[in-house]
Structure formats: C-alpha cells, structure tokens
C-alpha cells in the first residue's frame, strides 16, 4: 500500500512539473526574437492577473491545460502582458505593456492577440492576425478559434 501511495505521489508530481514547463515571456523584445528564430507568431495575452476574474478563469479553463500547452509549444511564442493592481512590476515592463495595449487597442480583459513579427531594414513590425478572449467550452473550443485565426495567415 505504501508503495502505491508513493508511486501515485511521484506521478502527480511529474504531471505538475510537466504542466509548468510552458514559458510565458514578459519581455516582448525577447519573445519577438524567439518568434522570428522559430518562425512562429506571437500570442499576446493581455491580462489583469490579480484582479480580473475572466482572465483567471481563462487561465484555469484553457491556458493552464495540457491541451493548450501542447498546442502552444507547436504553434506560438507566448507573451504575457500583465496589468496587475497589487503585484509590483518593473517600470520598463509597465511601459512596454501600456504601449502594446495602445498599439493593439485593447479595451478589456482578457484579450489575446495573435501577431506575426516581420523584420525589414532592421525594424521589427507586429502584423495583427486576429484576436480572441474568453470562450466558453474549454480548451477544445478555444483552440478551434485560435486555429482559425492562424489558418488565415497562410
């Protein structure tokens, strides 16, 4: 019985570690370089992580699921653009997030924009592909919409 409990704890610990392997960049410059290198679009997640109920719900129901994490690994570079009320944030990140919020005309949370970075004459542009937000129905329903947005870029 002890061996079974220990084995279950090890399996649960491994599953938790695997779920935490998803990397969300907070610096858009770093994410853009990575996206250009990997030839993948950016997924820009505009969120209020410590106050926005719909943002927290989207994370729980979609963004922190194994289905989403597997899809994201193959399809996008993840960027979290947070607008917290209680959590301190570096001034550079606050400024970057505010500029991107204005650039993408984000008016509510959560908002997710898909953008394709392109580089021309040493300058990087973010071409908007489409946006999403909270979609009821779990990861399958949300990913269906995301795949439609990404299919339109081709």
Model-inferred region functions:
Residues 61-63, 99-154:
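Non-catalytic, surface beta->alpha helical segment in thiol-disulfide oxidoreductase systems
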Residues 24-42, 72:
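A short beta-strand-turn-helix
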Residues 4-13:
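Sec-dependent N-terminal signal peptides
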Residues 55-73:
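Typically the conserved alpha-helix immediately C-terminal to a functionally engaged Cys/Sec
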Residues 38-52:
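Short active-site neighborhood of thiol/selenol oxidoreductases, capturing the structured segment around
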Residues 49-52, 83-88, 107, 119-121:
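Solvent-exposed loop/turn segments at secondary-structure junctions
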Residues 15-21:
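Sec/Tat signal peptide C-region and signal peptidase I cleavage site
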């Amino acid at each position: 019985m002890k061996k079974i409990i220990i084995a279950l704890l090890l399996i649960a610990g491994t599953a938790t570690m695997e779920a935490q392997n998803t990397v969300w960049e907070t610096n858009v410059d770093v994410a853009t370089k990575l996206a250009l290198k990997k030839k993948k679009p950016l997924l820009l997640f505009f969120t209020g992580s410590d106050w926005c109920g719909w943002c927290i719900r989207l994370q729980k129901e979609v963004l922190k699921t194994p289905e989403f994490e597997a899809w994201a690994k193959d399809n996008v570079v993840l960027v979290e653009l947070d607008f917290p009320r209680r959590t301190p944030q570096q001034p550079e990140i606050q400024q970057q997030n505010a500029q991107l919020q204005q650039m993408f005309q984000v008016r509510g949370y959560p908002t997710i924009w898909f953008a394709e970075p392109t580089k021309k004459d040493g300058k990087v542009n973010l071409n908007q592909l489409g946006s999403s937000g909270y979609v009821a129905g779990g990861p399958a329903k949300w990913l269906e919409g995301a795949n439609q947005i990404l299919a339109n870029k081709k």
